[in-house]
């Protein structure tokens, strides 16, 4: 709700006195369906929560952050922003938009008190798939450790402490990031082969 978001900074300042940081961590996935099988409402909801929610929260709080001696903006994207997952075209697009938005803000805010960190998590135990009406997806033939939220939160805070530009959470995210840099087509093919069963 854009209007409620616009009113949020004043409410937070009234309760807490000041805002020194913002972590945009809202995210939902789409049902595991091909693009042409998705209805408009599902597509719009994914973009509204994942991208527009992050954008509106950032625009609402950034003026306050810029007035602080030091402040930090953290946007949580996803490994799905750079590695395409079958049945998650809209989710990937929304998180790719968050990734590029965050990288652009990092550049725009150089020379200001606001530091910016981009977070790219891999598989985490969050219940996001169950919220979308399905089971947690598992890659065929893969034993990928799932990151616990508490571990991810600690690593995120460590990244903020050292003013990291970009942090990959989880061994899967780190591996796929390296592979994607070496060969985007190969990385996409590996994910497609291991995740294609989700669409059958």
Predicted regions mapped to residue ranges:
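SDR active-site lid
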Residues: 107-171, 189
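Substrate-binding pocket helix/loop in short-chain dehydrogenase/reductase
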Residues: 33-35, 42-44
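Active-site helix of classical SDR
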Residues: 58, 94
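A glycine-rich helix->loop->beta "capping" turn
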Residues: 11-22, 31
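The beta1-alpha1 cofactor-binding region of Rossmann-like NAD(H)/NADP(H)-dependent oxidoreductases
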Residues: 1-7, 40
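Active-site loop immediately N-terminal to the catalytic Tyr-X3-Lys motif
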Residues: 36, 85-89
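Residue(s) in the substrate-gating loop at a strand-loop-helix junction
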Residues: 78
